[in-house]
Amino acid sequence: MVWRLVLLALWVWPSTQAGHQDKDTTFDLFSISNINRKTIGAKQFRGPDPGVPAYRFVRFDYIPPVNADDLSKITKIMRQKEGFFLTAQLKQDGKSRGTLLALEGPGLSQRQFEIVSNGPADTLDLTYWIDGTRHVVSLEDVGLADSQWKNVTVQVAGETYSLHVGCDLIDSFALDEPFYEHLQAEKSRMYVAKGSARESHFRGLLQNVHLVFENSVEDILSKKGCQQGQGAEINAISENTETLRLGPHVTTEYVGPSSERRPEVCERSCEELGNMVQELSGLHVLVNQLSENLKRVSNDNQFLWELIGGPPKTRNMSACWQDGRFFAENETWVVDSCTTCTCKKFKTICHQITCPPATCASPSFVEGECCPSCLHSVDGEEGWSPWAEWTQCSVTCGSGTQQRGRSCDVTSNTCLGPSIQTRACSLSKCDTRIRQDGGWSHWSPWSSCSVTCGVGNITRIRLCNSPVPQMGGKNCKGSGRETKACQGAPCPIDGRWSPWSPWSACTVTCAGGIRERTRVCNSPEPQYGGKACVGDVQERQMCNKRSCPVDGCLSNPCFPGAQCSSFPDGSWSCGSCPVGFLGNGTHCEDLDECALVPDICFSTSKVPRCVNTQPGFHCLPCPPRYRGNQPVGVGLEAAKTEKQVCEPENPCKDKTHNCHKHAECIYLGHFSDPMYKCECQTGYAGDGLICGEDSDLDGWPNLNLVCATNATYHCIKDNCPHLPNSGQEDFDKDGIGDACDDDDDNDGVTDEKDNCQLLFNPRQADYDKDEVGDRCDNCPYVHNPAQIDTDNNGEGDACSVDIDGDDVFNERDNCPYVYNTDQRDTDGDGVGDHCDNCPLVHNPDQTDVDNDLVGDQCDNNEDIDDDGHQNNQDNCPYISNANQADHDRDGQGDACDPDDDNDGVPDDRDNCRLVFNPDQEDLDGDGRGDICKDDFDNDNIPDIDDVCPENNAISETDFRNFQMVPLDPKGTTQIDPNWVIRHQGKELVQTANSDPGIAVGFDEFGSVDFSGTFYVNTDRDDDYAGFVFGYQSSSRFYVVMWKQVTQTYWEDQPTRAYGYSGVSLKVVNSTTGTGEHLRNALWHTGNTPGQVRTLWHDPRNIGWKDYTAYRWHLTHRPKTGYIRVLVHEGKQVMADSGPIYDQTYAGGRLGLFVFSQEMVYFSDLKYECRDI
């Protein structure tokens, strides 16, 4: 027993030194790459094998490579086993291209090989690099990238590359070279799923990705449950087997039977034969290494045998070890029925028995015997005919069978034995080639240049023989020939003459002279050894041989520039004067083009801009802030055709302004300096040169901006960034605006309870109980919660003896609320002319039902031009002029006055149309008079800051003075609107949940742009707010109104009103005026006959949101009826009416509108006149 264990140890020890153990023949690539559920970018899923995780990779830059030690083992085994198997279960995304396995390095972007499933091409590509040359082998129609699970087996063995999907062989191909012999592990990295580029990463799921060695493809498929259809043939020994595959130290001398063959032409290319020689050289080295290893193992075994004493029969004698048994020298034994082996000098030599042909049709095989035998008697040959010739071999290549037959006369003989004999036959070896695509050979060297000088061509070729396409493989793609230009030495160029020059002028005009001409040898010049031109460079001849006549022009009788003609008799005549002169040719005078063509040069004033010269003319440069040409010419024709054109500069149009990218360039005209201004777009604030974000749309940025020097307006950080407060009031200077400060005066009393919000009064004393503290009450002892102070002297109207401050006590003042020291009262009704709504008609009650500022006693509502002023009070009754501008105060409005400033210069020629300047002084000649330069209406507000630069009655936006118009004045259901004024009239807040009402300003407009910020600072109620324009009376105006939610008005009389959410544009033309009818018609979204007509309603029905800032912009052009309403939410357009045309009213006043909605902020209000 001990002896057997020793022998077993001797057998195992050398075998374990020769290669890897079984556990090293299969590598789990996920395991040796340390890929698990914690790996960044690897998502774990459930695959077909529930016991093993499947992975999808999303971050390929985090995929770890195979462990370096394992990679070294893998590359070593690949070289030893001459290939590998890659098995995996995969689910590849449809039509994607993904890498299964790749080995890269030693460089950063260098790859040694990769296996890629190319979904778009439906191929499995094996790409490998040898000596910098890229090789690609593709298996076609693989069907992997279809988003279905596949069980794949990729085999790279020897020179074969094949793919099994499931149990089916899909395709196989021959490799040009065994690339695995060149693989390097040092400084290299092996990756699963990671491609060389982003588009080559594997997209899908992977499971059970293994590299397998030692096994055959049949074993691997068998483990996967596949049936072995030809398993017996794989290991069978045929007659063509040249050497038996035995143990590592067992040799064989068996050579199968040979058959005579005719010489065949070599079907292999030179490159293939070269590869074969290279492989044989490598095999020779490997065999030598194995032989040396085997000798060392034998020596080690001999030493062990001597050490332990060895078996008696084998000691000091030759012996062989085979199949766990010892055989003595020259001992012969039977391996199987057809193989015998003999021990000779420690080597086992085996022989295969060759069987003779059977002499019968159905030979029998006896157990234990190798060859078949025929069972018949010796006397069976009697009666048979001679054997026929052998048939053709049953196969065309490889091993097959042949038969021959004989006949017997059974009437006279028993004829024992077979009538047919069978024997084996062996033809030429079968063609085992597989389909392969053609490949180009290397390019041949370039040929010599096709010319010896100048430009020629060189050519190189390549052949489609590396390899040659076979078995239906594809031909090479591309051209087999390349040609490119080559440059030889320059060729010699002979010189040639240029054409003769024209003849020179004759040296004399008569009596014979000389003229000459020349030529040059430059067409071309002689170069590179070429010949020079042959002939003369110069040629001469006689000229003007006639006799000289008497010349009357020798005395220069004509004006310079006029042609003189002489005659044989000595007389002469002069031609016409030169261009730019007038005369008979003898005497010529300068032509004054500037006087004859007065509009040659551009002119904006009386200053001449055309300069006459002798001869000709030229224009001065265009005036400042104009650009154009500067003609220069001679003669009347040039003056008529080459006129000067100067156009005003427009930096906004020319894109030469320096406004911020989020600002709008506004052109002010070429007379202004600067000619434009910059305004930040909605959602931004700043000085226009720099703009920052403005969340609450009140014109102040969220953060401080670094604006230009001394430009602080709209550049300082908003002190209430989430609540519109365009005035930025901050009474206590704590950096928090009053609008969002809970205690504006820091007296410890919150604003909601403070009776003096802007004055420190912690004691809250209020003597008159009007909820206004004594410290801030302008009438501390008189109840006056409204705190009205008409003359702004600090004393409230309720306790003032002179409300308007005109030094006339109230009880004697016929206009107690209007300053009028003269106390004029034309109609004697006790109401002074300054405040009388009918100054020429006696009406002491001053009733004004339609709120148009014209008393009912004198209001006839006859207005032929629809500008809001009845004909007998309109200063241009037949021309619409809602603003009633009259700068010379002559009672005739500017719209119909041919001389607005009454300076004697008609408007169409007046360089200051609105300012008296009869001298029309314009020093810079730009067409704008000096007296109105940069301030056209002379109101002391520069045009760049003037909201109406052509109306001195309006200079800035101001709603501090407004008319409150209740639209439903009767009843006590709700209270009237309560308006709070901020920011010098540029911000109004309506605090009450009120009846419909308007706060309308007193400025009147024709064409106008009106914008403002809308904000509801409460979550209570959901009704209407908006603005009015074109206001002429409480029965005639346009209104833009916005409802938060759809709602039916709670009073269904006199008409039922349905209000839909969203922005509406309506025109009011009420026959009843203020009251219930107009109230319900305003609430209703749609048309109400005799009251309201809806021009547009936002089809998206988007209502306003609580605590959200919106910015509206109105454009109104009464001459064309153009109306457009634009509403922004932040920087985005929320509603846009687009162009709406309506000419019901030709202008009017602007105002703000509310209907049953409290805490509405109207901030950063801005109106601007547009002279259109």
Curated annotation (Swiss-Prot):
Domain EGF-like positions: 549-589, 648-692
Keywords: Calcium, Cell adhesion, Disease variant, Disulfide bond, EGF-like domain, Ehlers-Danlos syndrome, Glycoprotein, Heparin-binding, Repeat, Signal
Each TSP type-3 repeat, start to end: 693-728, 729-764, 765-787, 788-823, 824-846, 847-884, 885-920, 921-956
Any GO MF annotation of the entry: heparin binding
Cellular component annotations (GO), alphabetically ordered: basement membrane; collagen-containing extracellular matrix; extracellular region; platelet alpha granule
Domain TSP C-terminal: start-end pairs: 960-1172
Segment forming the signal sequence: 1-18
Motif Cell attachment site: positions: 928-930
SMART domains reported for this sequence: EGF, EGF_CA, TSP1, TSPN, VWC
Glycosylated position list: N151, N316, N330, N457, N584, N710, N1069
Family stated for the protein in its record: Belongs to the thrombospondin family.
Annotated protein name in UniProt: Thrombospondin-2
Organism (species): Homo sapiens (Human)
Lineage: Eukaryota, Metazoa, Chordata, Craniata, Vertebrata
